[in-house]
Amino acid sequence: MKSDDQWKARAELIQSAPEVGEVTATTLIAEVPELGQLNRQKISALIGVAPFNRDSGQFRGRRTIFGGRRAVRSVLYMAALSARRHNPLIRAFADRLEARGKLQKVVLVACMRKLLVILNTMVKTNTHWNPKSA
């Protein structure tokens, strides 16, 4: 990846986001070639961080996440843990969810999805991290 200028530029773009390191950027580039080409709903479903409902008739089931690309979910989990503490945008988002009574794991998965959507938009628009526009 370091030898190819296109991949190197994409990795630097992804790493411009706070708390997104080399491992996260490399995994996203290698495992998700669709990054920057899909909308936020489709990229979230592809990775497996979009909630799916289990409704039938009048029964309203739980919303769960499943499927997707396990390696990407693993690195997003670690990046979201770090971003939850150090990224002001993700921290404010998580605090809002916790204030509404959401559980810690639910909040963390929502942070994973938020981080993925931000990174997808950054790649799509070819812009570096800007906390005001994120």
Regions found by a protein language model. Name each.
Residues 1-134:
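A detector of single, family-specific signature residues
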